[in-house]
């Protein structure tokens, strides 16, 4: 039996804490591809593509050599460029699905809620672990299972991530901070495979590790089954779980929040009160045409807007400049980050001239640094929430705490303008870090790559948190899942370019990533388009607010009230 929204609200801290842990170990673990790649090679996945050519130079992972042409092995299995290309293709497919599946998931989640998706995701993740374990039992015949396993892994991981992004709706003004925390745990999940590699290096069987991991995914399934509600979590503007019940006896065939119910009842009551005072057919027809009359006088008529008039349509949100520019930013950033993750081991091999022990060491360092996302992602969330508590929340009544010592009301910031200001800072800062990361990648210095690891980790945590916070701030909560999914799908399609870039690096460029990195650095400059537009958008909002204040003063002189009304 699924819990109600009121029950889920009481358990929100438990759900948030477990969601962070579950994201850390069961969401985007595929982002730790460098460590998984080493283990897959050690278990012989696609090793049958490698052969000893004539005049070979044998080179194992400890550095012992004979003869001329280089051939290496790992844990007794041959490794080669053809194997790298095939496994990188599997990573490309899995990472694509990790993002591309977001759009249908977002649409489904907005309509049906997160519970069923999270149950499906945890089950898919467990099955993916079992498939990898089965493939490792006979890699010469079952290596192809890695494609199916990584697809299920990507699907399950995105289900876990996406559903956790609905939880921050229960935390009010801290929503962006909690979104950042969820995305931080998602980004930090890249540490999972490096952690598993440490256990693997201690001598634990790869198959045993995966079976235990699949069993842990079962615990995630049961946690969701007993704690997550069927209904979607409403946004903070509709938050009132204590009175959320089903009013079927009032003619509502859906569940509504207390605030929505209050709005429905007061609207109906107002229309009944005004309608009862009407005497002639003309006034009645005005009511039937969708107009409402103020209770104070029948002569004061105000056009009644439909509820959806205040909320932009989904297509209007899709074609808004903010969303389109955010797509450009995410496409560029996603390609830059995904290419580095997929090619990192080969880039390190190029720098150390094939020393696999050094490559393994730096891969482990990269994995450990992924935990930085848990610390850095909330920073961008804090930037997105900066000074929102000091903003005008739209209430007309001033509290005592909102007045100065001389009794005058404090001048508050506009909430929408403050959100745009915060988003501008977040995206500008993130893109500067992305450019810095691109510059460090151009320098062929091994110790400097640790700085590249740090910048890569910070940018990956920042960009997703910034986009999630921006969408939560600008667009209706009912569109959040669909818009985030659309953004993920388009950026995932663009990130497929990492496979031809990888083939170009391994083929014509002979393993040298210099020119690929130069091109990606140039493309990264497009990321500054979004913060520049947000600056102009903020100025437009400031002009509108100034005009609104001047209009309110005019109405105050005419009607004695700042409301935009006029007596007939």
Curated annotation (Swiss-Prot):
The keyword DNA damage does not apply. Glycosylated. It is a multi-pass membrane protein. Glycans are attached at residues 55, 60, 64, 422. One of its GO terms (biological process) is phenylalanine transport. It comes from the Eukaryota. It is found in: Cell membrane; Basolateral cell membrane. The chain crosses the membrane at residues 20-40, 89-109, 119-139, 142-162, 176-196, 202-222, 322-342, 364-384, 434-454, 461-481, 489-509, 516-536. It catalyses: L-leucine(in) = L-leucine(out); L-isoleucine(in) = L-isoleucine(out); L-methionine(in) = L-methionine(out); L-phenylalanine(in) = L-phenylalanine(out). Its main location: membrane. GO terms for molecular function: L-isoleucine transmembrane transporter activity; L-leucine transmembrane transporter activity; L-methionine transmembrane transporter activity; L-phenylalanine transmembrane transporter activity. Keywords: Amino-acid transport, Cell membrane, Glycoprotein, Membrane, Transmembrane, Transmembrane helix, Transport. One of its GO terms (cellular component) is basolateral plasma membrane. Uniporter that mediates the transport of the stereospecific L-phenylalanine, L-methionine and L-branched-chain amino acids, between the extracellular space and the cytoplasm and may control the transepithelial (re)absorption of neutral amino acid in kidney and small intestine. The transport activity is mediated through facilitated diffusion and is sodium ions-, chloride ions- and pH-independent. Belongs to the SLC43A transporter (TC 2.A.1.44) family. This is Large neutral amino acids transporter small subunit 4. It comes from Xenopus tropicalis. The gene is slc43a2.
């Amino acid at each position: 039996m699924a819990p109600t929204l009121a029950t889920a609200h009481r358990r929100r801290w438990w759900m948030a804490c477990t969601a962070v842990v579950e994201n850390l170990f069961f969401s985007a673990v595929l982002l730790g591809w460098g460590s998984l790649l080493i283990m897959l090679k050690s278990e012989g996945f696609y090793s049958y593509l490698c052969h000893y050519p004539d005049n070979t130079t044998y080179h194992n992972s400890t550095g012992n050599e004979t003869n001329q042409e280089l051939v290496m092995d790992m844990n007794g299995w041959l490794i080669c460029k053809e194997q790298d290309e095939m496994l990188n293709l599997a990573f490309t497919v899995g990472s694509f699905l990790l993002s591309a599946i977001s759009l249908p998931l977002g649409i489904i989640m907005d309509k049906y809620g997160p519970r069923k998706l999270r149950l499906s995701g945890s089950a898919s993740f467990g099955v993916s672990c079992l498939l990898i374990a089965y493939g490792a039992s006979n890699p010469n015949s079952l290596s192809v299972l890695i494609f199916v396993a990584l697809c299920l892994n990507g699907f399950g991981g995105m289900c876990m991530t996406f559903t956790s992004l609905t939880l921050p709706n229960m935390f009010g003004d801290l929503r962006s901070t909690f979104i950042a925390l969820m995305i931080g745990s998602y980004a930090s999940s890249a540490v999972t495979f490096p952690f598993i590699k440490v256990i693997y290096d201690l001598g634990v069987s790869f198959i045993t590790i995966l079976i235990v991991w699949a069993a842990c995914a079962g615990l995630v399934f049961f946690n969701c089954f007993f704690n997550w509600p069927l209904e979607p979590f409403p946004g903070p503007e509709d938050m009132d779980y204590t009175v959320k019940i089903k009013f079927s006896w009032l003619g509502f065939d859906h569940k509504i929040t207390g605030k929505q119910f209050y709005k429905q009842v007061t609207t109906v009551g107002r229309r009944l009160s005004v309608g009862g005072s009407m005497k002639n057919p003309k006034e009645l027809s005005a009511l039937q045409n969708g107009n409402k009359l103020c209770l104070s006088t029948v002569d004061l008529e105000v056009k009644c807007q439909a509820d959806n008039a205040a909320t932009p349509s989904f297509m209007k949100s899709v074609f808004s400049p903010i969303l389109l520019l955010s797509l450009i930013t995410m496409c560029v950033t996603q390609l830059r980050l995904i290419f580095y993750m997929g090619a990192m081991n080969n880039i390190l091999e190029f720098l150390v001239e094939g020393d696999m022990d050094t490559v393994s060491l730096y891969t482990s360092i990269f994995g450990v640094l992924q935990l930085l996302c848990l610390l850095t992602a909330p920073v961008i969330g804090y930037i997105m929430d900066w000074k929102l508590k000091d903003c005008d929340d739209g209430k007309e009544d001033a509290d005592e705490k909102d007045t100065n010592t001389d009794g005058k009301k404090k001048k508050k910031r506009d909430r929408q303008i403050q959100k745009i200001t915060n988003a501008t800072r977040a995206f500008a800062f993130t893109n500067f870090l992305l450019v810095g990361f691109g510059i460090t990648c151009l320098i062929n210095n091994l110790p400097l790559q640790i700085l590249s690891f740090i910048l890569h980790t910070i940018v990956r945590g920042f960009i997703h948190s910034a986009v999630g916070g921006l969408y939560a701030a600008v667009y209706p909560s009912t569109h959040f899942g669909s818009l985030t999914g659309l953004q993920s799908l388009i950026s995932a399609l663009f990130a497929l370019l990492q496979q031809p870039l990888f083939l170009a690096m391994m083929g014509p460029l002979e393993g040298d990533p210099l020119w690929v990195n130069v091109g990606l650095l140039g493309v990264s400059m497009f990321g500054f388009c979004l913060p520049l537009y947000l600056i102009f958008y903020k100025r437009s909002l400031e002009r509108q607010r100034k005009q609104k204040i001047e209009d309110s003063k005019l109405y105050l002189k005419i009607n004695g009230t700042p409301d935009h009304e006029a007596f007939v």
